[in-house]
């Protein structure tokens, strides 16, 4: 994209993709700029599309930028920034996973970070127990009524992730070209790249483990916002 001279020239670490060039209008708010970053780098599998899930920090000292103040009033030309994920508070009786793990809904590209484990995949429902453990809320989907409120649970033991079915509603685990495995009440190991299929709801979720990719070559073609 091309940019005018009125834009700020910035360098941004987009999660594991380091030192990327960006051009931004100084009048943009942080959420507007983050939204543009998410669109520009949508090829990153574990990068979501909801600006409020992220914040921008100054690379020099980790100071977060203020969401309500235009970026031109907070940083100058040539500034280095870091895009980071906002952590959600831990529910009681849960732990942080040992790695950054995600489920990516294959049709829309929506990314759900599993901020705790055990993590429930299903639908938020205040009337049901363990509502605070729902890390993947599929309620907004048009086929959500075919998803159980407490459908699946993902846990970790010794660095290995497992998935089990908490409901009578079927789910399948797809791995490469292997025959699909039914997910039952007996935990199955989860591997990076596995796809969890909720067949009745026509929803497929890819399991992604963020290992920390090697530093990407700096981009000399700045994205404009």
Language-model segments: residues:
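Residues that act as N-cap/strand-start positions at coil-to-secondary-structure junctions
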Residues: 17, 106, 146-148, 182, ...
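Forkhead-associated
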Residues: 53-67, 151-152, 159-194
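Residue-level recognition of conserved beta-strand positions in structured domain cores
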Residues: 123, 165-166, 175, 200, ...
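C-terminal regulatory/effector modules of DNA-binding transcriptional regulators
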Residues: 179-203, 208-224
